[in-house]
């Protein structure tokens, strides 16, 4: 059994990680930390987990206990993993970080977007960006994995086939993305209140969202050159889900784009390229570690519209983290992740 530690288990990504690992036949959660809830039983805080973690309680982070684990997940706000990851890596413990701490390879760029100096720039050379559909072989050998964000996951998987094939005008990419309210986290905030977010939709961070440099970094690597991206996120009145509507102009209209996408993702267990003319729904991936994609060329022109949907807490966070765990430890990549989406 893989001995697992979780730092920061009281947020939405933390409890989703617990839910998924409860069904994992090769993983056992030995340590889960929370300074604010130390001593509280996991099953008392999350009744949905009763019968799965009845002997497990939250504890104050302890380097010795965490260092005795085979792998530690960080489901924490940005900056926390900076302080603890180095010590764990030195102890031989693998680290899978769900925060943004190691996603960007440029420490100065990270500081610009996150409003503080990068706390562990010396570890960036060891960090592997945990998008399995791109970095599977690097993940197998990794010590430190940076799990991609939710918007970056949906957006990159939608654009990748076009950019890798050199078919898109990389200077004019548009990502029009919608997120459920759980993407804002569990902390109390006026904008996340039911009366504020219900029956309403709005764009936000149009000037620049923290996920912009992460998306741009991935798309630039896929294209092999600089890219131009306009990324506009929106908050929608649903709990879970990301819906990305992606626009690109193709430079060769003779290419069969449906075949291109189907071939690119034919061997990917968690990317579903839907039949031509489809319109994927966020509810079809609720609770599932799946990205569903459909590709369109309206009126047969040179503008391509890619529709990409994920559950922001699963393929956009905790499910992708478990997918990385499976790859890292040489397990079947689908282990513990074969859940179908929840309907209705």
Curated annotation (Swiss-Prot):
Reaction(s) catalyzed by this protein?
A: N-acetyl-L-glutamate 5-semialdehyde + phosphate + NADP(+) = N-acetyl-L-glutamyl 5-phosphate + NADPH + H(+)
Q: Which cysteines are joined by disulfide bonds?
A: none
What GO MF annotations does this protein's record show?
Answer: N-acetyl-gamma-glutamyl-phosphate reductase activity; NAD binding; NADP+ binding
Q: In which pathway does it act?
A: Amino-acid biosynthesis; L-arginine biosynthesis; N(2)-acetyl-L-ornithine from L-glutamate: step 3/4
For this record, an example GO cellular component is:
cytoplasm
**What single Pfam family name could you report for this chain, choosing any that match?**
Semialdhyde_dh
The reply to whether Amino-acid biosynthesis figures as a keyword in the UniProt entry is: yes
Per UniProt, which keywords does this protein have? Amino-acid biosynthesis, Arginine biosynthesis, Cytoplasm, NADP, Oxidoreductase
Please state the protein's primary subcellular location: cytoplasm
Q: Which GO terms of type biological process are on file?
A: L-arginine biosynthetic process
Location of this chain's protein in the cell:
Cytoplasm
Gene3D superfamilies in alphabetical order = Dihydrodipicolinate Reductase, domain 2 (3.30.360.10), NAD(P)-binding Rossmann-like Domain (3.40.50.720)
Does the keyword section mention Cell inner membrane? no
Catalytic residue positions:
150
Q: What is its EC number?
A: 1.2.1.38
Function of the molecule: Catalyzes the NADPH-dependent reduction of N-acetyl-5-glutamyl phosphate to yield N-acetyl-L-glutamate 5-semialdehyde.
Q: Which HAMAP family match?
A: ArgC_type1 (MF_00150)
Sorted alphabetically, which NCBIfam families does this protein's record hold? argC
PANTHER family according to UniProt: N-ACETYL-GAMMA-GLUTAMYL-PHOSPHATE REDUCTASE, CHLOROPLASTIC-RELATED, N-ACETYL-GAMMA-GLUTAMYL-PHOSPHATE REDUCTASE, CHLOROPLASTIC-RELATED-RELATED
Instruction: Give the family this protein belongs to, as stated in its UniProt record.
Output: Belongs to the NAGSA dehydrogenase family. Type 1 subfamily.
Please report the name of this protein according to its UniProt entry.
Answer: N-acetyl-gamma-glutamyl-phosphate reductase
> Which species is listed as the source?
Pseudomonas putida (strain ATCC 700007 / DSM 6899 / JCM 31910 / BCRC 17059 / LMG 24140 / F1)
Taxonomy, top ranks, is: Bacteria, Pseudomonadati, Pseudomonadota, Gammaproteobacteria, Pseudomonadales
